[in-house]
Amino acid sequence: MIGNDIVDLALAKKESNWKRNRFLDKIFTTKEQVLIVDAENPEIMVWNLWSRKEASYKIYNRETGIRGYFPLQLECSSENTTFGTVTIKDKIFFTQSRIENGCIYTIAVIEKENFKKIVRIDPAVEIFKKNGIPFIIDFDSNMEKPVSISHHGRFWEGVTLRD
């Protein structure tokens, strides 16, 4: 399983005032808020953690069928600005984020080894949905292949896992 998320930092800055009263309390656990306050660039940390939660939520939703808005149930632990984990209930997701070209891009997987199997999807590839969950058709096997799609502002990314 794979999930991804992308944040256009310019758009996030324009549309979301993360410093407003109680914003952090509604989205981030106490532990995550400490990471934000202690960060060299708190704004980048806000969107880095948000991106990790969103990418992990996509896997959680696909695995459990549970949809909803519960960011406080997804808790990030950060090894560094690139690698970390997100935990929800008894599930752990591994995340890898990169910050470049005005965006934060995160991929989440259920096994660390899956980072080696990531394949980017060409935006021209036809993407289908079943119950709101995206997939592509693998033309070699004619089988459905799960994908994760994310877009925000100027950015779009799609990924799947190589067999």
What residue spans do the PLM features occupy?
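Core catalytic alpha/beta fold that binds nucleotide/phospho-ligands
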Residues: 1-163
